[in-house]
């Protein structure tokens, strides 16, 4: 059943279409009226009657050259253009009809005038024929804009009608929603335990290896991938169907990047323990000296339990490597921190605390920018089984 607003909208659409059709029907009748008084009266009567009933046909005008001008014309209620394209096509057709009828009138009207009233009728016929050449194409152009506008106006109604036959929400439940997930919205350690029991690599391992091979792709982590593909890939991950980078299409970089960042966003709890998150915010709010801040961040990072530290290490390491390719991928530490700050530091977004969100982004910015100075402890290779080349630790930044 339609709502009151929908009924009002539909009624407004009907009135707009009928009003436009009546106006243009009357306008076209000016240039197609015959020279005889009787015919003029009949034509005006037809137009008046049809206009009164809002039944002027869009694709026909009252033809004064009919063999029986006194008979009333038959008109049908025009079908409204349903979409912009439909309206535009009708408008183009109307322009063509106007040009043809105008050209026809400049020959036909003088002939009929001369036949009925001699020289005087011929002169009047020429005048009406010329007016038809001007008016009918002009009306066609105006109708083009009218039909197009009607199409735009009626598009929401077309969508509403289509929605009536669409499947209800309960009918669109995907299979993945009925199967217990392995990774998404599952506690971090539990997902690792489940993956190990099933003998499959963790989603993070596959995503990190996949993205690491494509670090120079422009807009990585910023450009959204295909929603359809993201849902499909996520479902396959949660069913244990993706076990290596070979199971992923090389062109799915934006989709896989989206899945990687979404994984951290939808963890029930951040990969960083609450105690360390609190310390991170304290450092950001109280320490302004760059060297002191880096040293304080390093101390907090290295106090994170080994399991969470390894996951955080792998994540920040990947982001750091991507930032080193920012000339190609346009993803600087600042851009990356905006993407990952809220997921890793969990600021109170619902309350709209802008300063807390900014602080979260700044903390992640520092973790990415000074990764090698802050993450001095090696990760546990048995957790994600990702091998890293040994890189020298750079000295702490100096003021």
From Swiss-Prot:
Biased composition range(s): Basic and acidic residues: 1-13
Intracellular or extracellular location(s): Cytoplasm
Site note Arginine finger, residues: 222
Gene Ontology terms, MF aspect: GTPase activator activity
PROSITE patterns (UniProt xref): RHOGAP
Regions of compositional bias (Low complexity) in chain numbering: 61-79
UniProt cross-references to InterPro entries, sorted A to Z: Rho-GAP, Rho_GTPase_activation_prot, RhoGAP_dom
SUPFAM superfamilies reported for this sequence: GTPase activation domain, GAP (SSF48350)
Protein name: Rho GTPase-activating protein gacC
Protein function: Rho GTPase-activating protein involved in the signal transduction pathway.
Keywords (A to Z) from UniProt: Cytoplasm, GTPase activation
GO CC entries: cytoplasm; plasma membrane
Ranges of biased composition (kind: Polar residues): 14-31
One annotated GO biological process: small GTPase-mediated signal transduction
Region (Disordered): 1-80
Source organism, top-level taxon: Eukaryota
Domain Rho-GAP: start-end pairs: 186-375
Residue stretches in coiled coil: none
Pfam families named in the record: RhoGAP
Taxonomic source organism: Dictyostelium discoideum
């Amino acid at each position: 059943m339609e709502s009151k607003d929908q009924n009002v909208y539909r009624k407004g659409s009907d009135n707009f279409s009928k009003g436009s059709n009546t106006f243009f029907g009357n306008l076209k009748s000016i240039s197609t009226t015959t020279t005889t008084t009787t015919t003029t009266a009949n034509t005006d009567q037809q137009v008046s009657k049809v206009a009164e009933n809002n039944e002027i046909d869009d694709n026909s005008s009252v033809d004064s050259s009919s063999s029986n001008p006194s008979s009333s014309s038959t008109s049908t209620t025009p079908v409204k253009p349903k979409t912009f394209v439909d309206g535009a096509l009708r408008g183009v057709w109307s322009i063509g009809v106007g040009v043809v009828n105008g050209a026809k009138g400049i020959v036909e009207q003088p002939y009929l005038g001369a036949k009925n009233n001699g020289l005087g009728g011929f002169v009047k016929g020429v005048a009406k024929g010329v007016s038809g050449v001007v008016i009918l194409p002009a009306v066609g152009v105006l109708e083009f804009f009218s039909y197009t506008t009607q199409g735009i106006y009626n598009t929401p109604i077309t969508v509403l009608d289509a929605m009536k036959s669409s499947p209800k929400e309960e009918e669109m439940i995907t299979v993945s929603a009925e199967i217990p997930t392995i990774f998404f919205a599952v506690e971090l350690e539990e997902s690792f335990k489940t993956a190990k029991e099933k003998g499959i690599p963790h989603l993070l391992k596959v995503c990190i290896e996949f993205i690491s091979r494509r670090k120079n792709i422009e807009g990585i982590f910023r450009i959204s991938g295909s929603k359809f593909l993201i849902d499909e890939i996520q479902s396959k991950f949660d069913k244990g169907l993706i076990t290596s980078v070979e199971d992923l299409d090389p062109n799915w970089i934006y989709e896989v990047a989206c899945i990687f960042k979404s994984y951290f966003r939808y963890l029930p709890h951040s990969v960083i323990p609450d105690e360390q998150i609190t310390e991170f915010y304290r450092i950001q709010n109280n320490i302004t000296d760059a060297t002191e801040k880096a040293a304080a961040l390093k101390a907090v990072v290295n106090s994170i339990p080994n399991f969470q530290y390894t996951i955080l290490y792998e994540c920040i390491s990947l982001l750091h490597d991507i930032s080193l390719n920012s000339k190609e991928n346009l993803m600087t530490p600042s851009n990356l921190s905006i993407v990952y700050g809220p997921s890793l530091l969990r600021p109170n977004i619902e309350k709209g605390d802008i300063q807390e969100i900014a602080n979260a982004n700044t903390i992640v910015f520092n973790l990415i920018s000074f990764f090698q100075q802050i993450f001095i402890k090696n990760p546990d290779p048995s957790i994600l089984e990702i091998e890293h080349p040994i890189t020298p630790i750079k000295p702490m930044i100096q003021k």
